[in-house]
Each structure stands twice: as C-alpha cells, then as structure tokens.
Swiss-Prot record:
Gene3D superfamilies the record matches: Cytosolic phospholipase A2 catalytic domain
Protein name: Patatin-like phospholipase domain-containing protein ACLA_029670
Subcellular location, record wording: Membrane
Transmembrane annotation, as ranges: 85-105
GO biological process: cellular detoxification; lipid catabolic process; triglyceride mobilization
Positions occupied by motif GXSXG: 306-310
Keywords: Hydrolase, Lipid degradation, Lipid metabolism, Membrane, Transmembrane, Transmembrane helix
PNPLA domain location: 275-466
Matches recorded under CDD domains: Pat_PLPL
Recorded GO CC terms: lipid droplet; membrane
Sequence ranges of Basic and acidic residues compositional bias: 649-664, 677-686
Bilayer disposition of the protein: Single-pass membrane protein
Amino acid sequence: MTSAEKSATRNIYDPSALPDYDTQFIKPDELHQFEKALNAPAAAPLVAINDWRPINQRVRKNRRTKPRRSKDETREGVLYTVLKWPFLFIVFAWITVLGIAYALTRLYIFLYEQCVTWRGKRERLRRELSVQTNYRDWLTAAQALDTHLGNQKWKETDEYAYYDHLTINKVVAQLKQARKAAESEVHNGRSGVSDLPAVEDLCALLEACVKNNFAGVENPRLYSESYSGTKDLVQEYIDEVQACMQLILDSKQIPAEEKYQHFKHLDTNFGRTALCLSGGATFAYYHFGVIRALLDNDVLPEIITGTSGGALVAALVATRTDEELKQLLVPALAYRIRACHEGFTTWVWRWWRTGARFDTVDWARQCSWFCRGSTTFREAYERTGRILNVSCVPSDPHSPTILANYLTSPDCVIWSAVLASAAVPGILNPVVLMTKKRDGTLAPYSFGHKWKDGSLRTDIPIKALNLHFNVNFTIVSQVNPHINLFFFSSRGTVGRPVTHRKGRGWRGGFLGSAIEQYIKLDMNKWLRVLRHLELLPRPLGQDWSEIWLQKFSGTITIWPKSIPSDFYHILSDPSPERLARMLHVGKQSAFPKIQFIKNRLKIENTIMQGLQQSSPGGDRVLLPILSRRLQNRAQEHADAMVERLDHSFPERHSDYKDESHYTEVSDSLSTNSSRPHTPDARRGSIFEEMRRQSAVFFDDPDMYGDEDAIAT
C-alpha cells in the first residue's frame, strides 16, 4: 500500500475530516418547543351536536340517549368467541411447522448450490466479484464471469420471451431513419415543426415509444440473465432513443414552446424514478453503502423516500450536496451515530416508567445533525434539488398515513418527521410533528396530533409516490430483517442470474424452488386468513400483520446481505469497523443493479433536461444536481452514446410496413448492420402465431394484489 493510499485510509476513519462534524445545528429553544409539544395534553376533537348548537359550552340535551355499545360489533357472536383462540392456536402451530420446513428447504438449496453450482473456475470468478470495491473493477470481473458462463451469446440473440423483440427491432430501425432525415432538415436551417416534416415524424415516433416499460424493455428479467448488462438490442434501443431526444433538444429551429410540450408529454408517459429506503433499525445503515454506490456512478435519483431507519439515511442524503455526501459516507460517520449510547440500567428504568426504551428529546438532538438542524422539506429541496419523502403513521389507528414532502408538508421540520417515522411502539413513544413558522420558531404540526413508525403500514409508499410525483419505477433498498429472511429469487434477480443450466434452471433445482415457493405462499395465506377474520390480537393497539403483508419490493429491489451478528447489534450504534463492512456490503449489493438504473435514467434525465431548458419563464436554469449529472454522463459515456449522423447510417432490416407513425426502411441499409440479430421473418400461418404466443411469459410480481406478502 502506497503512502497516498495509507493517508486516504486514515482519512476515512478520521471523524475530524467529516463536514460539520462538531457543528450543533439545532438550537436549545427549538428542543424546548419540541419537549413542550410532547408534554401538551392530547388534542380533543371539537364536535358540535348539530349545526346550530355551540361547542365547548353547556347545553341542555335530550334525556333520552341511546346507550353506547361497549363491544366491537364485528366480533360478537357465540361461535366467534368459542372458536377464536382454538383456531388461532392451530394456525400459529401450523405456521411454526411451515417455518421449520422453510428453514430446512433453504438449507437444502444452499447445500445444493455449494456442491453442484459453485465449483471450479466459476467459484473463483465469483469470489473475485465479491471483493471488488468500485464499480469499474466489479464490472470487469462480472464480464469475465459472463464470458465463462456463456451469457454473452444470450445478449447477442434478440429473441426472448419476456419482451417484444420484433417491435423493438422495428422501432430502432425507424428511429435511425427518422433521425437521419431530421438531422438533414435541421442542418438546412428551416424553422418551426410545420416546416420540418422529418422532425415532426421523429417527435411522433418518440411520443409513441418513450413510455414506461415500452414493449417490455424495462422488465427486470432482461437484466437477470447476466451479471453485466442486458440484450444488445435493448441497449441499442435505449441509446437510440436518447440520441433522438438529444437531437430534438439541441435543435435551434424548433420553438421552445413546442419543445416544452413535447418533453412534457414524454415526461407524463415515461414517469419518474424514486429510491425507497426501508426501515430495519440498525440494519438501515446498509443503505449508506447503497447510496455511496449510486452516488459514485451518478445514478442517484432525485426522489428519495425513507421509513423508520431509512428515513434517517434519506434525510442525510436530501440535505447534503453530492460533494458533502462523498465526504460523509465513510466509516468515520460512525462517530456521529450515537442514538444508542445509554447504558442498560438507564433504558430499562425509562422503559418501565414511560413504555419506551429511548428518550425522544435526546433522539431529536442526535437526529438534527443528520438533517442539518431544523431544516424543512421545502428548504432541503431548494438546497440540493432532491425531493425527500418520509412515511408517518398517526397514532390513531383509524386515520390515514401521511407521506411528508415539500408538497404535502413544506414547512414541516425534517427531524420531527424522521423521529415520528422511527417511533416503534416500545422503542420510542409517538411523536409530535413540528412546523417552522415565518419567524423561524417551531410549533406543533397538524393540531399537535402524534405520529409513529411508518413501516408499520407503508414501508414502501409506492402509491403515494405515483400520486404526487408520477413515480412508476422504484429502486427499493430493503433491509428489514424479518423480510430478508424470506427473500429468495428462484429464477435470479437483476445482475444475479441463476448459474444452474446456464441461467435456464432454477435455484436448488425445480423441486427445491417449488417447495420454497409453496411453503412461503402457504404462510402468506394463513396470515391473510387470520387478518381478514379479525382473529389476530392487537398489542399496543397496532395491527402487526401489516409488517408481513404489505408490499416490500419495487421494480428493482436491492437486498444487502446481513450476518448473524447484525441481529445482536440491532439496537446498538455501529463501530467504524462495522460501518465499513456495511458500506462495502451495501455497495456490493447495488453494483449489479447499476446498469439497469443507468439505462432508465439515461432517458429520464434527457427528458428532464428538455423540460428545464425549454420551460417558459425563469425556470430554464438547470437544477445543480441535474446539470452536474448530465456533464458527468457526457464525459464518462461519450464513447457509448450514439453519434450524430453525418452520412449514411447502417440500418437494420425490417419488414414492418407503414402503420401510424412508422415508415418502411430501405433494404439496402440492412446489409451493413454492425450487430448480429434475429431475422424478422413474417409469420406464415396461424400455427406459427400460436407457437409464438405460447412462448411469451408474463412476469407479474403483483399477481396477488398490491399488498403482497412475504417477499418473493
């Protein structure tokens, strides 16, 4: 190790090198206001008897009042009372048996993979993959493993059952031809879309194909058959779409208003990408490694949501710039994580007196450093351009959850939302959200009502993100320990293919995967039966079945691999050495997903750039995070981008006829295609069409509804 490397290693363990390490952002008066709000009496709802009678005053009521029912009407009945506990005992006993069988099945699959799959050279290449510390070296090792396993041949073949390769072939050919004609028109100097028919055709083509998961090109299965990348045809399609949009964006002849309407249409159809950080107590520190991997490769989404422990990480990311994050996401950050610094006797006595292990005001003081003091959601967005979202659940079980962000609660103080999202019953008592007034002082938010852990109901708020920000592509970093135990992808996941039978097999063989799926779905079924029959007890007034039966995955799900000692330290502060390991594991778990995320953001960032530069008024200034990302992408990936056409471009052969926006491609252009592809022969009979349809598979992770259970 050179002297420079030794110095760099010392710096990442030196707390004094952290930005604002000794800064105390929060003011004592703000903590006092928070403590006062916590100790205030519960807010009573103001209810009038009718429209004309006053409230909070004595009134003469009718003496004939109906007696209030003291029982839950849905739980009355002789059979319910007699059968509830025996049925509950039998079901729990059966779930226990299924749990033991599941553990034995997973042990069998583990031994099967170690003894049958990972042997010889492939095992050596896999070990080299697991020790890489940066994405460039990891990608080199992944490509070597793909070459050894024969995955490169799979990339070169267009046909695949999980996307429509025929449509993608035709669209790529049409885009290339339309881009060539549009460049010729733009270079001639004419202005206005009406005077540029080729540009108008190109815009129509883009509006037809720039959509979320168009023809299945964003199906995770396309990235689950190799360690690096996807089908060559899919990569060519993404590069060509980005090049065509860049042509429209750079054109001086197209009026800004027409550009804006075009990119607004694309933005609505394509949607946005969000990073979702799950809860999981101290397991949430694995998120730091995931964030660091995405940050180093310029693929960190602007929309970030966090729940419970993930909310603390999301708050740190949303309140710091990229440069500050690169200095903060190092092992020395462990010196600032002091939430569990109290001794055993202290927290036991507090739990006995208050019902919570940790002190809320002390946690507010510790958490405020990660949020840069009493920063609000609006202030964080204005400082970094990132959109922070935090899930909070009201202490009243009948009230809806809230996704706090700069739209729904712009003046809400971030650290109060983070505390509320982490207020697990028995760990931290429900918390009052705080809002910042115009004079800078703090006051209770939402009439002083209290909130608690968001992961109890909505660990991953996909629906709310789609409602507020048109998010339809989610990157989920999932570290909940009770969910990670049941994570198993029988056919591989993004960047982690099944090596058995060259990716065509099942983990542990078909029998092992079938048994695993059956047991997991059976446990899921019985938990749902108990919940729908209202047989589950509700300790602390909480329906705990939600921690199993909600949806915990996204379009891309990152699962950092935990170790047994993490369960022992689940409520303790990490040491620098343990945080260094969690950073490495988090980065390793994110590396296989980066190429998929890059392809998604390549199109999304170009759309956002078009909206920013062509929007009317004074909104044409690029956000710092977007402009910096676009500059880095242009510098690092210039060799991979499709260049402008100055001469005849070799086209792919297509039999696609003129329909809607598409036109026929000349056969002379197909002979010089630089990439081997599957012939686009027209199907000659109904039997051929039936054969093709029967070979198409639909990978639907939501087949059991929005509240999918234990992760699959």
